[in-house]
Amino acid sequence: MKNLFNFFKTSSELRLAYRLLKQINQKRSFYGAMTDFDLANQTNIFKKRLANGEKLKDIRVDAFAVAREATKRILGKTPYDVQILGGLILDMGSVAEMKTGEGKTIASIPPVYLNALLGQGVIVSTVNEYLAERDAEDNGKVYNFLGLTVGINKTEMDANTKRMMYNADITYSVHSELGFDYLRDNMVFSAAEKVQRGLNFCLIDEVDSILIDEAKTPLIISGGKTNLPAQYLSANQFVNTLIAEDFYIDEETKGIKLNDKGIDKANAFFGLRNLYEIQNSEIVHRIQNALRANKVMKRDVEYIVQDGKIALVDQFTGRIMAGRSYSEGLQQALQAKEGLEIEPETKTLATITYQNFFRLFKKLSGMTGTAKTEEQEFIDVYNMRVNVIPTNKPMIRKDEKDEIFATSHEKNQAIISEVERVHKMGQPILIGTSQVVDSETLSEMLNQKGLYHTVLNAKQNQLEAEIIAKAGRKNAITIATNMAGRGTDIILEPGVTELGGLYILGTDKAEARRIDNQLRGRSGRQGDVGISRFFISLQDQLFRRFTNFDQIFGAYGQTNGAIKGKYIHAVLLAAQKKIEGFNFDMRKTVLSYDDVIRQQRDLIYAQRDILLQIENFDHYIQKMIIRAVDIILSYDFIILPNQEIHYKNLINFLNDNLSRITHFNFGQIGIENYPIEQLNEFLIKQLETIYFKQIQSVLKENLGKTYFESERYIILSTLDSQWQNHIDTIDKLRSSANLVQYSQKNPYQIFTEEATKKFNILVAESAYQAIVSLFNNSNAEKIEYIKAILSDGTAISYPADSPQEIIDQIIASNEERIAAARKAKEEKQPEFIEKQLAKLKIEKVESGEEFELWKIGDSKLVNLKKEMPLDEKQNILVKMQQEQLEMMSEEEKNLIQEQNLEIVEIEEIEEEIQNENPQKVEFVDFKNDPDAYNKLIFGADYADKQLISSEEEDNNEKTNINNNEDLERTKGEAQQTAKNPNE
């Protein structure tokens, strides 16, 4: 009855998964009896079923059963029922919470295999490249056995390699690179340059880390550097003059701002009348960054200094965030604080949050050891339910009560004492810290006690997996920041179970209970014994920021030893729940702001995709001309306040901006004859005529059929430039929205209204700027060409105004090419001739000192002088071979005709040859053109073209020999090219 009750407590998804699991298990013996070939061939069968109209759910049971059997055969591991349950939840587009050590990697194989059968690509996202490589290599063996391809997307790969990886059936990638590739794909100028092939299904490993912990951090591609080191140094110098009474810090939000005393000091320092006047916004911005860098952010907590550079530290994982930097000048403020070289500030070119990127996938699922506490956020933001998958074996780890102390010093002393006690027994212990500085403090204290240990923090990131894997050995003491080594199992060494398993010791509480549970979960995998305990102090950040610290510390601050009583534990739990809610609200705020940008980004990216696909921009350009005219006629120096037109200003403006290439004079078309109500339509027609009749016709003449690529480039680059300016403006607008007070309006409303206005300006301005660029397209200039005849008779063309040194280079490089072709021909000729003779059944059978004996066909022999050039020997031998043609069958003649050999009738061949070449041939001679038979063999343009290699000739037998008409046609094409060099 208890199990039945638990069954109905589960979600509808999990209940469905149990029913499907039963059906999958019933297929076990059927697929288990198949040969490897038959099992692997099920992939083809499934694909045919899908092609015939069936859906994934129709083949789900069979596909899961096949994947399970393949995993057993290839990896030697049979997926447990709970792993199949987890896989089914993943296929449903939900989150599977599976405890550490329950085999999430194996659980992912069936759903990934099933979804890859659609042929639209499946992406498996991981938190680091080590895990991506490991899982791709291990699981890839199963997928390869089943006939699917696997790719690994890495940061350092070039675009071609990335494209190949994404085109695989299944692609493994670190999550950040997926987002950056998406942004880069929407900055290309050709659809063929894109690397991703659509966002179909993504399975996210450690989904809470990516979609919750990193949700607030946007992905940013930067460029357009601005170098103003003096301003950062000045702001840093000012902040260092401040004392605590000059500014206010909000402990909860970590926000900071100057108070009245600080503002007075700023006015005096920078020589200002009022710091917050609009013209001082840049100074305010740099002061805010300097305040945050110096008074809020801590070295070895939020960042470290490594090799003279600022390296960001992920606050949830403790890992270095490689390749990432703070934006909007904060990175430069930190560099000024630390006395480092100040790098140029960059401009945001493209940005997206993880929240909005992963919501682009048609289907999204994830797996983690801890997600249930964040289920509401997964539902609200990603429409994903969290299903807790039961463990394969009962969990027997002991989670002890927290030990709470008054001060950090007392806490650290208690930690060292506990480590000494546990270490004496030989029990391995993993000490989890949230900050690099804490790990180094404890490490120093252990060194003083002579306790050998290993430290894993952001500074030893590359050794992460190796260090964590060894944490289960006897006597091992490991210090690790937060979730370092996540995804790597800690295997207990033989004998450790008897010692009590792995001891997890947490040194403070995280901002989310979920993170604490992840640390606990490193112990007690697959029914192993283990223990976990947290050591806390009232001076920890959690108490300082999210409790009534003064009251709590006043009541318990003088306590010696661990603080007892339920109240203090209740305060701790309440503080964690409070900060969880606070962080959730922050992520929702980030998402709400980014949703405004997302709608605009979707419109721009959709427009880019259209522009990448079309090959005729006429309709698009017509619409842009209409927008451009609207903008021109909105300028107040053209349309005066009284609605009168300043025709002279208008004509000058048009001539200055739209006539640089055509030199068209807008003053000669009677603009001044059109009143304001007719002027708009008149200008539109005039600009259309100028562009399509003049500019575009020259483009076609100069660039040929690819003229539209020039138009595409101009339109795209203009759109990108305006969009990038817009993003940069929006970023500053978002950061300043909360600082501006508007009556009866909230910051989000202000941001939305301003962002919408600025987007409308972007659309109009990009159209206008594109028209200006199109009308001034340098490719539309009239160019006169002249030609030069090369030594091989071909012609090359170049612009008449080309510099002489460029012309000389062009001619020289072409002559080098011709010389190289001739040399290659000479080197290949002997080999090629002998191969051709062999095809005609002519071969050398004996070679003496002076003569060579050649066999022609099956019955004729001829002796030729050895010193005779090979091409002359060829002429004679081929001619001799013709004597036998009359004796050939029709079938043999047809065969020769198929080889493009001309059958000729020759009378008294031996007598003719003997009379004309008595010195070189004992009894034969010839009288025809020496190249006549070469042309029979090699084609009518034999003397003009390079001999192809014998390997190529084998594959192109019918194209090696051309007739005289081919030569004439080739010469005609060369002449035509000289007239139209750009085609």
Swiss-Prot record:
Q: Which SMART domains match?
A: SecA_DEAD, SecA_PP_bind
- Keyword annotations: ATP-binding, Cell membrane, Cytoplasm, Membrane, Nucleotide-binding, Protein transport, Translocase, Translocation, Transport
Residues annotated as binding ATP are: Q83, G101, E102, G103, K104, T105, D489
Q: What is its EC number?
A: 7.4.2.8
Q: Write out the GO cellular component annotations.
A: cell envelope Sec protein transport complex; cytosol; plasma membrane
In this chain, the stretch annotated as Disordered covers: 948-983
Reaction(s) the record says it catalyses: ATP + H2O + cellular proteinSide 1 = ADP + phosphate + cellular proteinSide 2
Q: Where in the cell is it found?
A: Cell membrane; Cytoplasm
Q: What is its main location?
A: membrane
What membrane topology does the annotation report for this chain? Peripheral membrane protein
Q: Which SUPFAM superfamilies match?
A: Helical scaffold and wing domains of SecA (SSF81886), P-loop containing nucleoside triphosphate hydrolases (SSF52540), Pre-protein crosslinking domain of SecA (SSF81767)
Write out the GO biological process terms.
Answer: intracellular protein transmembrane transport; protein import; protein targeting; protein transport by the Sec complex
Q: Where is the composition biased (Polar residues)?
A: 973-983
Task: Please provide an example of a Pfam family that matches this protein in its UniProt record.
Answer: SecA_PP_bind
Provide the GO MF annotations for this entry: ATP binding; protein-exporting ATPase activity
Tell me its family.
Belongs to the SecA family.
Please describe what this protein does.
Part of the Sec protein translocase complex. Interacts with the SecYEG preprotein conducting channel. Has a central role in coupling the hydrolysis of ATP to the transfer of proteins into and across the cell membrane, serving as an ATP-driven molecular motor driving the stepwise translocation of polypeptide chains across the membrane.
Q: How does it assemble?
A: Monomer and homodimer. Part of the essential Sec protein translocation apparatus which comprises SecA, SecYEG and auxiliary proteins SecDF. Other proteins may also be involved.
The protein, known as: Protein translocase subunit SecA
Name the source organism. Mesomycoplasma hyopneumoniae (strain J / ATCC 25934 / NCTC 10110) (Mycoplasma hyopneumoniae)
Output the lineage of the source organism. Answer: Bacteria, Bacillati, Mycoplasmatota, Mycoplasmoidales, Metamycoplasmataceae
